[in-house]
């Protein structure tokens, strides 16, 4: 069945109680706010709508993102920012025993989230991790990538938080 969205004259804050807003390109672009985004968010909050923020960026702490949003004049607590690191750590924790070893390749935020779920962060395949979580990390080395490969080859669950772009005429993704 193909459902069509219907238009309405009612403000969105009267139709929905919660807005999950993507950050990158919706609320801000890099360090700069998207024009009118903060005003619209404040209006929705004044009308009683709860606002939460989501991002697939695994490299920044929730508190850092919340601070940036407060700089735009928004009332935001870190718990209102849902990063891919938060989701990944919780997801893996549901699929492995408490205290399980997890090889983490990513920013400190990702490592902290995994440890915060009661899991043991390791750096080497020889530590026999039950899972691997790889986030965006521009400082990763060939050795770290090799450790990820070895762990996955040995049967570790693999979760990547890295966005793979859609192929274009110039891209080849295998």
Sequence positions of predicted segments:
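Short acidic low-complexity segments
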Residues: 9-11, 119-130
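Asp-based phosphoryl-transfer active-site loop
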Residues: 12-33
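Active-site phosphate-binding/coordination module
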Residues: 46-124
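Short, well-ordered secondary-structure micro-motifs within conserved domains or adaptor modules
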Residues: 126-143
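A short, gly/pro- and small-residue-rich
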Residues: 141-162
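Single conserved hydrophobic/aromatic residue that forms the stacking wall/gate
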Residues: 163-174
């Amino acid at each position: 069945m193909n459902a069509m969205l219907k238009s309405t004259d009612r403000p969105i804050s009267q139709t929905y109680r919660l807005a999950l807003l993507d950050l990158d390109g919706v609320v801000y672009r890099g360090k700069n706010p998207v024009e009118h985004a903060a005003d619209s968010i404040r209006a929705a909050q004044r009308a009683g709508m709860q606002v939460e923020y989501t991002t697939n960026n695994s490299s920044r702490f929730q508190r850092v993102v919340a601070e940036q949003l407060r700089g735009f004049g928004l009332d935001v607590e870190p718990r209102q920012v849902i990063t891919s690191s938060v989701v990944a750590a919780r997801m893996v924790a549901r699929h492995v025993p408490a205290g399980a070893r997890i090889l983490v390749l990513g920013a400190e935020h990702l490592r902290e989230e995994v440890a915060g779920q009661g899991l043991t962060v390791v750096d080497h395949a020889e530590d026999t991790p039950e899972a691997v979580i790889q986030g965006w990390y521009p400082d990763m080395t060939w050795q770290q990538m090799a450790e990820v490969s070895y762990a996955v080859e040995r049967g570790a669950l693999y979760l990547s938080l890295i966005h793979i772009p859609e192929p274009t005429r110039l891209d080849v993704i295998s």
